[in-house]
Amino acid sequence: MLDPNKLRNNYDFFKKKLLERNVNEQLLNQFIQTDKLMRKNLQQLELANQKQSLLAKQVAKQKDNKKLLAESKELKQKIENLNNAYKDSQNISQDLLLNFPNIAHESVPVGKNESANLELLKEGRKPVFDFKPLPHRELCEKLNLVAFDKATKISGTRFVAYTDKAAKLLRAITNLMIDLNKSKYQEWNLPVVINELSLRSTGQLPKFKDDVFKLENTRYYLSPTLEVQLINLHANEIFNEEDLPKYYTATGINFRQEAGSAGKQTKGTIRLHQFQKTELVKFCKPENAINELEAMVRDAEQILKALKLPFRRLLLCTGDMGFSAEKTYDLEVWMAASNEYREVSSCSSCGDFQARRAMIRYKDINNGKNSYVATLNGTALSIDRIFAAILENFQTKDGKILIPQALKKYLDFDTIK
């Protein structure tokens, strides 16, 4: 959440930055008008309370003064009305504020959509085939790796059931991801059923309510990303400054409606309602957030390098970043059959945006004051998509899949055929 005082006192700057994030200008104007009304109501309420306090002293001395008693009764009703008006305007102002995204860091390129993203680097050698490579969906079917029909029978479309060697390969990918980062990040195993407050704290609600699965007739949701659980481990807590930074990781199942995926690739294991990934999260002082982001994206890249998968790094523009992010890098892996890069990681610094919503602070060692921490999150990596990338990039002419060297220690086979 943005700091309402900064937004109010430096409106022109915030208006420019929020318009760069594709925020509707009408909503900004509505916030300013509601904020003015809220402060006016508060001022009138405070004056009425002061008057009531003075009047109460007079009534105490003149208990039989009917005029004073009538005036006191009338003032109490006025205070109640003013209090209701203040709360109403405060709630509207808060709701508007919760729908504003974070403002972009100064190093982020301005743009409306993904066409303005910047490609910063490419790593790895793309495979060269003397045959037409098959898409991972076809390889899954030919090699009996994923029982798409059985998953559809059990759950519906865009769910998958990995079989035998595919399940083992997925586990090997997961183990590699954890092992490469376990020396830096404390590992957690977390619940996937979460409450509404946790989703609000990280910025998934109210903005993306149509993309999360809500459990019917309950106050619970299925987690869309492990970022939610990891960030909320410290909701309403205060760190000692010397305990920062904190690095956490978790691997698990995530659930999304993918409401806006019409026209996007949904076949195979790329865009699923239920998917697996390893998540990285950091808590640090705000002035260190961008340097911590650079380190985090390198932590994600090392997995792609270990697997010898070609990839590129993108710096996302203002119009393509996630709601809570101030700066985001995407890592995209090469998909040999479709001849394109596909996202497997998104690493973001959120500044104090999430911490302000979740009330996560630290106590300054010098002055003893409490300040908001910065939070960072990154996927390292999407397990189902890495599975797809391995199939496409490590396939052979005779229909086999070669296992990347980095995964062989986790498996009792080195080819899938």
Curated annotation (Swiss-Prot):
**Top-level EC class:** ligase
Question: For this protein, what is the EC number?
Answer: 6.1.1.11
Q: Which UniProt keywords apply?
A: Aminoacyl-tRNA synthetase, ATP-binding, Cytoplasm, Ligase, Nucleotide-binding, Protein biosynthesis
Which domain of life, per UniProt?
A: Bacteria
Q: Which CDD domains match?
A: SerRS_core (cd00770)
Query: Which pathway does the record list?
Result: Aminoacyl-tRNA biosynthesis; selenocysteinyl-tRNA(Sec) biosynthesis; L-seryl-tRNA(Sec) from L-serine and tRNA(Sec): step 1/1
Q: Name one GO biological process term.
A: seryl-tRNA aminoacylation
UniProt GO cellular component terms: cytoplasm
Which residues of the sequence carry a binding annotation for L-serine? 225-227, 279, 379
What catalytic activity is recorded?
tRNA(Ser) + L-serine + ATP = L-seryl-tRNA(Ser) + AMP + diphosphate + H(+); tRNA(Sec) + L-serine + ATP = L-seryl-tRNA(Sec) + AMP + diphosphate + H(+)
Q: Where in the cell is it found?
A: Cytoplasm
Q: Which residues bind ATP?
A: 256-258, 343-346
Q: Note one Pfam family from the annotation.
A: tRNA-synt_2b
Q: Which GO molecular function entries does the Swiss-Prot or TrEMBL record give? A: ATP binding; serine-tRNA ligase activity
Function in brief: Catalyzes the attachment of serine to tRNA(Ser). Is also able to aminoacylate tRNA(Sec) with serine, to form the misacylated tRNA L-seryl-tRNA(Sec), which will be further converted into selenocysteinyl-tRNA(Sec).
Family affiliation: Belongs to the class-II aminoacyl-tRNA synthetase family. Type-1 seryl-tRNA synthetase subfamily.
Q: What is known of its domains?
A: Consists of two distinct domains, a catalytic core and a N-terminal extension that is involved in tRNA binding.
Note the subunit structure: Homodimer. The tRNA molecule binds across the dimer.
Q: Which PANTHER family match?
A: SERINE--TRNA LIGASE (PTHR43697:SF1), SERYL-TRNA SYNTHETASE (PTHR43697)
The entry's protein name is Serine--tRNA ligase
Organism field: Mycoplasma genitalium (strain ATCC 33530 / DSM 19775 / NCTC 10195 / G37) (Mycoplasmoides genitalium)
